[in-house]
Amino acid sequence: MADYRTLFSPSGTGSAVTVLVALSLLLLLSQATSDPCYDPGGRPRFCLPPVTQLVGKAAAPCSQTCALPADSPDPVCNGTLTLDLDGSFLLTSVTLRFCTAGPPALVLSAAWAIGGPWRPLWRRPAWPGVLGGPKKVTFHSPPGPKTRIVASYLRVELGGKAGLVTTGVRGRCQCHGHAARCAARAQPPRCRCRHHTTGPGCESCRPSHRDWPWRPATPQHPHPCLPCQCHPIGATGGMCNQTSGQCSCKLGVTGLTCNHCGPGYQQSRSPRMPCQRIPEATTALATTPVASRSDPQCQGYCNVSVSSVHMNLQKYCQQDYVLHARVAESAQVSASSSLSSLSEAVGPEWWRLAVHVLAVFKQRAWPVRRGSQEAWVPRADLSCGCLRLRPGADYLLLGRAAENHTDPAHLILNRHSLALPWRPRWAGPLRRLQQKERGGACRGLLPPTRSPGPRN
């Protein structure tokens, strides 16, 4: 059977008291550690550091008459006293104490810098017949956010003889409503900034929170600094410009938040380089032979003398046709056909090639249709190695329409044309060039004076 005396013993009572004390301490600790710049829900709010006694220095010290004998020949101070507050503060009150009767006239001014401009805070004019003023003068800053007084220097102008003993200045650090604590005696005073602000007076946003320009907090709106909305892949980091919010973008990336590719670039799958420059259609002539050197008649006959052609918009526009075709078969024909008018210029015989046009990337004036049709090649061009076509192979055919021919419907492949072994990767760039041509990009780009050739 349990002993009830043990349950209600003094030791049990002591444990309950200990628990109550611990709970009280936790409550006080939570209140002490609560942030005045945030409400209980974690939302930012306007906050100010506490009022403190500020320390000033006398730039033009006057005599302490209370420490001098009463019969001193000059026991009073007459002139101007300037106080350096060692920082920018919001003034709440200024107290002047005199050990003799105060001066009949007194002017209190404040300024941001030692040279002014000075703003009068309080003025007491001299009255006729009045020999002096009170021994203690206190100036209080008027309430309201629009009448706050921010000063780094104070100036006291004494309009008569008086013995000034002490000057008491009270105020709070100028934290622009973004801090509730401040090291007022530091030089310069430093606010413990909140709302993602930084600087001695919380006068700017952190580099990572510059989505909107910095603004001072008000009781109606705390104006916290918002994080930069930089794209995690397109931007070089999380920092943005304090004025515009522009993020620092990677090469080829543009936009306020670096979220899309710029002109001339296309999206890639690489997180390190998300936008890559759109490549020009590059075609290789590794399998296109040069002219035969054994036959003297072939020397300098062919136009093809290099191994690569870089197809850009200008060279594309200078072509009469750009085709993707497959060579099917060939048969020899005589020059007595309908193309006999050309036989004198390029040779006595022709080769007729049966080709299958798979795609038309640039259409000539006389349209070339997809499907099976004939292409005509001069025999001399084939024998000199200007064109080497293999049955069953796919080629990219580029060239200009033959001049002085009797049938414009025929597709002519001569020494000025290019027959390049087809590469599937060329289709995308060529389609983009075709879209630009349809949009009018080729207007004004006249064909060259001579037939298109490879890049030197």
UniProtKB/Swiss-Prot annotation:
Q: Start and end of every NTR domain?
A: 298-442
GO process terms (BP): animal organ morphogenesis; dendrite development; motor neuron axon guidance; neurogenesis; tissue development
Spell out the subcellular localization from the entry.
Secreted
Q: Which UniProt keywords apply?
A: Developmental protein, Disulfide bond, Glycoprotein, Laminin EGF-like domain, Neurogenesis, Repeat, Secreted, Signal
> What CDD domains does the database record attribute to this sequence?
EGF_Lam (cd00055), NTR_netrin-1_like (cd03579)
Tissue localization of expression is:
Expressed in the olfactory bulb, the cerebral cortex, the hippocampus, and the cerebellum in the adult brain (at protein level). Strongly expressed in the subventricular zone,rostral migrate stream, and the subgranular zone of the dentate gyrus in the hippocampus.
Q: Which residue pairs form cystines in this protein?
A: C173-C182, C175-C191, C193-C202, C205-C225, C228-C240, C230-C247, C249-C258, C261-C275, C298-C384, C302-C386, C317-C442
Residue limits of the Laminin EGF-like domain? 173-227, 228-277
Would you tell me the Gene Ontology cellular component terms? basement membrane; extracellular region
Q: Which domain of life is it from?
A: Eukaryota
Which function does this protein serve? Plays a role in neurogenesis. Prevents motor neuron cell body migration out of the neural tube.
Q: Please state what the protein is called.
A: Netrin-5
Phylogenetic placement of the source organism: Eukaryota, Metazoa, Chordata, Craniata, Vertebrata
Q: Which gene encodes it?
A: Ntn5
